[in-house]
Amino acid sequence: MNIFEELKARGLVFQTTDEQALVKALTEGQVSYYTGYDPTADSLHLGHLVAILTSRRLQLAGHKPYALVGGATGLIGDPSFKDAERSLQTKETVLEWSDKIKGQLSTFLDFENGDNKAELVNNYDWFSQISFIDFLRDVGKYFTVNYMMSKDSVKKRIETGISYTEFAYQIMQGYDFYELNDKHNVTLQIGGSDQWGNMTAGTELLRKKADKTGHVMTVPLITDSTGKKFGKSEGNAVWLDADKTSPYEMYQFWLNVMDDDAVRFLKIFTFLSLDEIAEIETQFNAARHERLAQKILAREVVTLVHGEEAYKQALNITEQLFAGNIKNLSANELKQGLSNVPNYHVQSEDSLNLVDMLVTAGISPSKRQAREDVQNGAIYINGDRVQDLDYQLSNDDKTDDQLTVIRRGKKKYAVLTY
């Protein structure tokens, strides 16, 4: 099975320009290819991972990746299938975000070894050197307004309005392809399926300006089996930056993937062989309640993104919280595992009497209910049941001098911080 066949078998090929020519290029020698990442935030997220891992698969097959950080295009904003104009970021912010994204990409691509080691480029380097007049003369003249208006990504914005700034974005992305082809012999661009219009602007410019053929391959935008856009948890993006989405939160995200998606996601997001995945699928289908596919998926992706130690910690937090073993976890681990539960910062004037604190922290609705909860054995401090109405919280109840975990009943948690 050649690399293109494997990508297809994994569900990673959505659309290509001349497929026969692309397969020929990929099987006859080393291809230099690129994927672009606009710094629209200070971190990449799971939505970017499909293209990143596809890029890694091609590198493992011997091809040479260029990771393009859009320091210039990030200042403009891509209109593709966006309902409204993006708010423009400052140059300083975009450059800062570009640096952070560079660091994240080095986790996935090999920038050190071999004649196909990855190269990092920033389109700000060439766009900052070209004047507006030169850009219009040397690039703009190859694009007709009719051609630009025909793109689906533009059509959808015509009625609501699109600025010239965003309208011109596709020309900038097209010029990226031309520049990388001219300087580095890059002949293939990879990106999300929503980028097709911008990406083919590059092949058009290559054909008209340099009489060369460029290839484009898009990866699918991933949705779950209900059609919901993939990569968000509780409406929030799942970030690759551990400070924005902890390894534990990412682990839980994959662990909670629906049964109908789990095997498909193993093909897309892991480097397990297709034979291994077929074996997992057989075991998984025999006992879906054991969630084998989700557990392996969570292990593989968290290890890939954050490393083996982070995976082990996420697994330990999961197991200890499930067993109610609060005392086996550090304050840092508890912060990860209980990041979504109510948090109350204890004030110096607060009463440390347990009944009072249950009401103050919003764990029990009233003192009467709080007393009943304590007497009925429904209150736990750091996993230990407390039934003393006169119990006073003390330093002994603080984990690493930072927090106390109170549980009411089986599932209602609150974290007290100091």
Swiss-Prot record:
CDD domains: S4 (cd00165), TyrRS_core (cd00805). Keywords: Aminoacyl-tRNA synthetase, ATP-binding, Cytoplasm, Ligase, Nucleotide-binding, Protein biosynthesis, RNA-binding. A motif ('KMSKS' region) lies at residues 229-233. Its main location: cytoplasm. It comes from Streptococcus pyogenes serotype M5 (strain Manfredo). The keyword ATP-binding applies. This is Tyrosine--tRNA ligase. Transmembrane segments: none annotated. Catalyzes the attachment of tyrosine to tRNA(Tyr) in a two-step reaction: tyrosine is first activated by ATP to form Tyr-AMP and then transferred to the acceptor end of tRNA(Tyr).
